[in-house]
């Protein structure tokens, strides 16, 4: 049987040891930074596809969730729509119709394009924020 030993760079080990028990609070801060960037891009894209007849209710319900711990132990943050609407319809349903269209109404994608457009900027901002948080410790 073969053995394999992996040695991490000393600098990385020092940074990881600094985090220690503060990993949860640091990861929340980092996720909120990335979530804010994606939220801004989704909001801008949604504004660009909405018609002048829009009530603004969908745009007003767009927001960021709290950072939650998933079943697998990963921290998650979500960009989404608050419920319910004043007319009884679901904001998620309205957003889905705008994103994918329906019979007689063409699709006006805003979520998929926001994800694609904000990915690089989000990763860079989260990386920078993580390094800032580690340096504070």
Model-predicted segments: where are they?
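Short, Lys/Arg-rich flexible segments
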Residues: 1-77, 86, 95-137
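Extended beta-sheet lipid-handling architectures
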Residues: 79-81
